[in-house]
């Protein structure tokens, strides 16, 4: 754990779950540290068993089976050791990749009252704890989620994460969907600038505090996102083709979708929506952090 806040009261803990060296960069990145200092966040990075060739089986990503309780126990221990008692019941920002992306989608249903926001990247895991089996209550689906995928992801693909997004977005979830065109199962550090902008907006809306209930998000204001997709020649673990974004924009709430466009979520401001559009329409993204 890192405490950029010093002796100030921690408003929330940003949990970045180790799933390879790319996602681990978030924990020590100077811009992330500055962001945490500005918003009075603690940074926590649980380590996991190796994703490949793990002793025994891979992690069980259902937080009800131990990992959720273990995280809360760790925060209670940090509260005592650090002199920050507020950590014992602090609110959480979640960031996970691949299997831990699926974990942090499930986690929202496990402890929705504690979660400020969940960033779910390239989410996927073995059945029955994959992204397609996440079950969220009407309260849990109102927790903001940022769902990110790679257009050339042969592991988790694009369709299953999108189906998860679409199912709950159509039930009123204030979520956003982001595609990194032609990007394989890796390299989410490329999303850092947009991710920090999104988190900044969500933190300001939800006003996390260990002693207060999180504010809800009013998605009647803001921007509705739409995309046009283009199939690639890559297939995921289940044999489903992946896809990239070949067009993106915004539309008025309640408007009929233009031909070929599908929903891609909601963002709280026009500025953030323009940054999203610029990002998802980039032809390619750097892949300098392959695991």
Language-model regions, residue ranges each:
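Alpha/beta-hydrolase active-site loop
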Residues: 58-86, 94, 106
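Short beta-strand-to-loop junctions in surface cap/lid or active-site-entrance loops
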Residues: 1-10
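The feature captures the conserved acid-bearing segment of alpha/beta-hydrolase catalytic domains
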Residues: 116-196
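Primarily recognizes the serine-hydrolase "nucleophile elbow" in alpha/beta-hydrolase
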Residues: 81-142
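The serine-hydrolase catalytic nucleophile loop
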Residues: 24-32, 48
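Conserved alpha/beta-hydrolase
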Residues: 39-53
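Short beta-strand element of the alpha/beta-hydrolase
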Residues: 9-20
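Alpha/beta-hydrolase-fold serine-hydrolase catalytic core, especially in secreted/extracellular enzymes
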Residues: 171-172, 181-291
């Amino acid at each position: 754990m890192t405490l950029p806040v010093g002796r100030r009261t921690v408003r929330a803990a940003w949990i970045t779950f180790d799933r390879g060296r790319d996602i681990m960069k978030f924990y020590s990145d100077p811009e992330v540290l500055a962001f945490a200092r500005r918003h009075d966040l603690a940074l926590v990075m649980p380590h996991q068993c190796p994703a490949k060739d793990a002793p025994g089986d891979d992690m069980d990503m259902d937080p009800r089976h131990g990992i959720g309780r273990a995280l809360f126990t760790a925060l209670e221990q940090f509260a005592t050791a650090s002199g920050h008692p507020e950590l014992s019941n602090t609110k959480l920002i979640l960031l996970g990749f691949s299997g831990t992306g699926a974990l942090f989608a499930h986690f929202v249903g496990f402890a929705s009252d504690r979660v400020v926001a969940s960033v779910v990247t390239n989410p996927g895991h073995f059945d029955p704890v994959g992204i397609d089996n996440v079950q969220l209550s009407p309260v849990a689906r109102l927790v903001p989620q940022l769902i990110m995928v790679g257009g050339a992801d042969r592991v988790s693909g694009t369709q299953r994460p999108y189906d998860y997004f679409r199912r709950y977005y159509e039930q009123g979830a204030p979520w956003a969907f982001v595609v990194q065109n032609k990007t394989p199962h890796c390299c989410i550090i490329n999303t850092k600038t947009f991710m920090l902008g999104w988190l900044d907006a969500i933190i300001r809306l939800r006003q996390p505090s260990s002693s207060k209930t999180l504010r809800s998000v009013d998605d009647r204001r803001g921007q509705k996102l739409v995309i046009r997709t283009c199939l690639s020649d890559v297939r995921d673990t289940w044999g489903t083709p992946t896809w990239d974004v070949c067009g993106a924009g915004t539309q008025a709430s309640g408007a009929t979708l233009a031909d070929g466009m599908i929903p891609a979520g909601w963002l709280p401001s026009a500025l953030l929506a323009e940054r999203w559009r610029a990002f998802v329409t980039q032809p390619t993204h750097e892949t300098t952090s392959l695991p």
